[in-house]
C-alpha cells in the first residue's frame, strides 16, 4: 500500500478530530452556562454563585444544606424548595414528587434544577440552621447482631441545636473494602461475631465509585452533649433461594452501612444536620404512643429520653411498644425499664416474634408476636378512644405498613400518626 496514502489518511483523520474538538469547545462556551449569577434566598439573602451546577450542590458550596438522603440522584424527593424565578420548567423526573398544586406553587427538587441564570428561591427557615462538620468517631460498637451504635463528636466549640426526632446526613466517600479485612471484629463483639461467621458476612466486599450522602435518624437527645449518635443496620444482600444453596445473592451490600461498619474510634467523617420534621407535639396533652422495631429505635429513643429526662413530663400518658426477633437483639432495654420505674405515666412493652427461652430465663417481661398484633391485643382492643392517641413510629417497612393498617381499621385519623419510615 502507498505510504503517502496512509499518511494522508491519518492526516485527514487528525484534522477531522481537531475540528470536532473545536466545535465542542465553541458549543460549550455558548451553550453551557458559565460565570457568576445572583441567588436570592427567601427574598433577603443574596449570594453571588457560580453557574452550571445543580441548585443542591450550589447551595451546599455556599453553606446551605438541603436534605438529600439519596445523594442528589432525584429518588428520595427530600431536597424540595420553591424556585420562584430562574428555574425553568419542571422536569419529568420531578413531577412524581409533587401534586399539581405544588407544581403551580413552583416546588422543585434542588438536585434536578440547574443554576443557569439569576434565581430566586424559598426554603424552610430551619434549613438555614443546618451545619456541616468534620467529626471524630468516638465509638462504633455492635448493640445487636447487625446493628451498630455509631457515635461521633462535633469539633471542639461547635454545637447543634435540634429537636429530638431529627436526622443527620453522612458523606460517603469513594472506597473499596473487604468485610473480613476492613471491619474491626472486636467492635462487632464476641456475642455477635459467631452469627456473622455463620451467615458468611465476612466474605462480603463492597465498592463505592462516587461520593454520595446518606441520612440516618439521630438516637441522641440534646442533653447528651455535642455529639451525634446513630443506630445503623448493615444492609446485606438478599439470601439466595433455597434451591440455589446457602449464601447471599451476587449483589453488593449497602454502600453507606458498609462504610460506617469499617469506621473506628479516631476516624474522621463529614456530617451535617439537623434535618427533618419528625418531632413530638410538645404543646399537647394527648396520650402518646411510640412504636418501633430494629434500628428504628433511634429517633424514638431521642424523643422519649428528652420528654422524660429533660422535660420531666408527668402529665401525659406515654407508652412505647418495641418489636424485635429475640431478646439478644434488643438494645437500650435497661434505659426504658428504668424510665418505667421513674415515671408512673410511662410504660414499656416488648414484643418478640416468638417465645424466647433466654428472655424467660432472664425474667424479662415480653409478649410473643408481631408488634402490631401485640399493640392491638394487649392495649388498643379495649382502649376507649384509640383515635385520640398521638402515634410516633419508626421501623422496617413491613412493620410500618401493618401498624398503619391496624390504626386505620381503628379509625385513627392520618394526622395522628407521625412516622419516620426508613423502609427496611
Where are these regions (language model features)?
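Ferredoxin-reductase
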Residues: 138-265, 324-325, 351-355
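Short coil-to-beta-strand transition motifs
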Residues: 126-135, 207-214, 330
